[in-house]
Amino acid sequence: MEQYEKVEKIGEGTYGVVYKARDRVTNETIALKKIRLEQEDEGVPSTAIREISLLKEMQHGNIVRLQDVVHSEKRLYLVFEYLDLDLKKHMDSCPEFSQDPRLVKMFLYQILRGIAYCHSHRVLHRDLKPQNLLIDRRTNALKLADFGLARAFGIPVRTFTHEVVTLWYRAPEILLGSRHYSTPVDVWSVGCIFAEMVNQRPLFPGDSEIDELFKIFRVMGTPNEETWPGVTSLPDFKSAFPKWPAKELAAVVPNLDASGLDLLDKMLRLDPSKRITARNALQHEYFKDIGFVP
């Protein structure tokens, strides 16, 4: 750990404290994540070390690069490139952002590019949200942070500071207790983020798992065996769920053009087997006029 000098604490993530730090060897500024593990007395599980080591191989312009993994005194520190702006901060500080469809499109394209890369390496994110989409102020390049950490460490219900981990971007199959979910969970999250960029407010801001599900069903319709074969067999599906009809997406996201609505509709299919893949989303007509993307 001698190589890294902490400069200041910059936040508290899902897994532990995040510091702005300096690499004493290269003098570059980095982000240092101290991972707080549940079973701290036992040290770091070897499975977590293996998972994290694989992530060092992931290199792509839309992924925050994991530069180093330091295992010291039963603690795990992850060293990432440093970016100080995230999509949530950007949306909060620039409400006019949603009025710029080109920028929304450019950010969405980069999110999908990063995800398609990860999925092609069989890595899921599972916890995508505006807070872990980082933006380079100079270039408007967008990079996904915390990819693969969920598999290494699990997703806690609360962070180590007892903040509730957000459910707003969680896919319906996870909320319904499916154990066999896959890459479509990330595409669902991206759909929610897409709508939020356009509407300037979260699409499904639930405050509990059941509230989250019902907020989804009120817009997308309550699923049944016809619309989602197998849904009634999921562990947390209840036949007593209210049966809401689906709304028109155009009424829910009124500022989005027809091709944008078509893409959003394909990302927000309740049945994960019918959801568009990240790779196919990049080929969608919505992006035909995309031009240069950082």
Swiss-Prot record:
Pfam families, sorted: Pkinase (PF00069)
Record field: catalytic activity: L-seryl-[protein] + ATP = O-phospho-L-seryl-[protein] + ADP + H(+); L-threonyl-[protein] + ATP = O-phospho-L-threonyl-[protein] + ADP + H(+); [DNA-directed RNA polymerase] + ATP = phospho-[DNA-directed RNA polymerase] + ADP + H(+)
Q: Which positions bear Phosphothreonine?
A: T14, T161
Leading EC class? transferase
Superkingdom is Eukaryota
Sequence positions bearing Phosphotyrosine:
Y15
Residue ranges of every copy of the Protein kinase domain listed in the record: 4-287
Indicate the residues that form the catalytic site.
Answer: D127
* Protein biosynthesis as UniProt keyword: no
Q: Name one GO molecular function term.
A: cyclin-dependent protein serine/threonine kinase activity
Binding-site positions, ATP:
I10, G11, E12, G13, T14, Y15, G16, V17, V18, K33
Q: Which residues form a coiled coil?
A: none
InterPro entries named among the record's database cross-references? CDK, Kinase-like_dom_sf, Prot_kinase_dom, Protein_kinase_ATP_BS, Ser/Thr_kinase_AS
Q: Keywords for this entry?
A: ATP-binding, Cell cycle, Cell division, Kinase, Mitosis, Nucleotide-binding, Phosphoprotein, Serine/threonine-protein kinase, Transferase
Q: Which SMART domains match?
A: S_TKc
Q: What is its EC number?
A: 2.7.11.22, 2.7.11.23
CDD domains attached to this UniProt entry: STKc_CDK1_CdkB_like
Per UniProt, activity regulation is: Phosphorylation at Thr-14 or Tyr-15 inactivates the enzyme, while phosphorylation at Thr-161 activates it.
Gene Ontology annotations for the cellular component aspect, listed alphabetically? cyclin-dependent protein kinase holoenzyme complex; cytoplasm; nucleus
Q: What is any one GO biological process for this UniProt entry?
A: signal transduction
Keyword Transcription tagged: no
The record's family statement is: Belongs to the protein kinase superfamily. CMGC Ser/Thr protein kinase family. CDC2/CDKX subfamily.
Q: What does this protein do?
A: Plays a key role in the control of the eukaryotic cell cycle.
Name the UniProt record assigns to this protein: Cell division control protein 2 homolog A
In its UniProt entry, the species of origin is given as Antirrhinum majus
Q: What is the lineage of its organism?
A: Eukaryota, Viridiplantae, Streptophyta, Embryophyta, Tracheophyta
Q: Which gene encodes it?
A: CDC2A
